[in-house]
Amino acid sequence: MKTGLFFLCLLGTAAAIPTNARLLSDHSKPTAETVAPDNTAIPSLRAEAEENEKETAVSTEDDSHHKAEKSSVLKSKEESHEQSAEQGKSSSQELGLKDQEDSDGHLSVNLEYAPTEGTLDIKEDMSEPQEKKLSENTDFLAPGVSSFTDSNQQESITKREENQEQPRNYSHHQLNRSSKHSQGLRDQGNQEQDPNISNGEEEEEKEPGEVGTHNDNQERKTELPREHANSKQEEDNTQSDDILEESDQPTQVSKMQEDEFDQGNQEQEDNSNAEMEEENASNVNKHIQETEWQSQEGKTGLEAISNHKETEEKTVSEALLMEPTDDGNTTPRNHGVDDDGDDDGDDGGTDGPRHSASDDYFIPSQAFLEAERAQSIAYHLKIEEQREKVHENENIGTTEPGEHQEAKKAENSSNEEETSSEGNMRVHAVDSCMSFQCKRGHICKADQQGKPHCVCQDPVTCPPTKPLDQVCGTDNQTYASSCHLFATKCRLEGTKKGHQLQLDYFGACKSIPTCTDFEVIQFPLRMRDWLKNILMQLYEANSEHAGYLNEKQRNKVKKIYLDEKRLLAGDHPIDLLLRDFKKNYHMYVYPVHWQFSELDQHPMDRVLTHSELAPLRASLVPMEHCITRFFEECDPNKDKHITLKEWGHCFGIKEEDIDENLLF
């Protein structure tokens, strides 16, 4: 026991001096100035030293107990952490005892080799021997040990409470992280904690110790300021927690209100969307119903209108299709149209192949006749199809009783059969007349067996005329048109008058003077110049309207057209025309050949007949009254045929320049 007490006394002397020095300082930072005076004033009596130590220990204990009580009062608000705090106190006491024993062991080992800060200051400032200082330290043994034990216990308690406080604060901050105000307060609390921690670290760094040694005296020096700092930190934490709780309550309430408001808005939006969808669906259904009603009404209206139009078209088409004939019977109008088309064909057939002396210049070409006939056939077929559709629509659209409807169907079927048979006969007749040609004044008509034959055309069936369509016949009579003239000729067929009646010239009949010999000599000069000017006009018109001249013809005319020496069209005197012919002979060679090829069409046998010359004659007689005598002079052998050589000689073309290769 004595050895144990002695050992404790030695430990007390080691711990007494720095503990007293720490308690005397206001900022928990011992310096040489604060420690040195206490250590330099060596007491004369042991009793005084012991009393002073007791007083300081009692004050330290009172301070630490007061802080512990304050922290426990602040922590009593949290009921959930009381039990853990009590357990922490008991465990901290046990840990404090263990720490005391460990510190005793360490102090016994390092006592001789680890002088404290107080002894270092004494060595530097005082000249007293080491034994006196050690005796002074031993005087402060008991109070040092007690104060050390109490400080360890209080430190462990405060650490437990701090460790419990920190997770509570952390969880509290996590729950209120969305609030900006609570975040600012949390940052402020952290800033308040950081200086305390940094101050503690600075204190630990400022307390010197020798390198390579584990000095427990330095740890004990820092324990009391740590208690003070930890207690202060706990007060700040509790205050900040109270502030955070108070500040978080309105933010939580506002957040709940916002959630409720958002939820209410969302419900309103959902309700409004549902209402809009219902309204849209109802509107769509109404629109569909209205469109259905309108479509039904439109269908009925359209059916009525179409039926009305079809009946009107039927009556009009039937009226147009039927017309009176010479026999008093009614014949289809479209057949009469074909007759009109064949009218010209008949005239052409009369005057063309049979070469009767008539006006062949105005006979339509075969292509024109065929196109006209095809058009009439297509029109006829279209009318028949429309009539069939009208009958079908009438059958479908009727809403009459069943018996009457069946009777009407029977009538319609019989009518359709009759019309179809008539239509077939008409189509067959039209097809047979397509390849059958009649001379002018005649029309093609098929008999009951479908065989085509030519009949005379009624002048009434000729198309409407204009004043410019008038022609003059050889009987010196003016006719409304060539159709009327040749229809009259057909009726007079078999008589002398009918045989002699021909188309003399275009226009109304007038007095034609007799051609003299001098005029016959001058006629070829005017005729050559006229043919040349006609080609120039066709060349100019062909650039805008293709089809007048082919490529070879254009190349030939181009040379004449671009020649600067060409005599322009005009009323020139005979002397000028003769001089130009001699000077620019080559410009007149091709126009003479071109006119022969234009007249040699029915047939193209390199020979011109009177019928082929008739178109040119009829157009020139009113201006050139010598044209008839000129054509008579061109046929010296009087065979009624004019060859290319005879034609060339009449126009003064040399025999070596007459070439059939120019007939293209």
Curated annotation (Swiss-Prot):
Region called O-glycosylated at one additional site, residue ranges: 25-34
Region Disordered, residue ranges: 28-360, 388-426
Domain Follistatin-like: 432-454
Entry binding sites for Ca(2+): D635, N637, D639, H641, E646
Biased composition regions of type Acidic residues, renumbered to the chain: 236-248, 259-280, 339-349
Gene3D superfamilies, A to Z: 3.30.60.30, EF-hand
Pfam families the UniProt entry points to: FOLN, Kazal_2, SPARC_Ca_bdg
UniProt-listed GO biological process terms: regulation of synapse organization; signal transduction; synaptic membrane adhesion
Protein name (database record): SPARC-like protein 1
Annotated source species: Homo sapiens (Human)
Gene label: SPARCL1
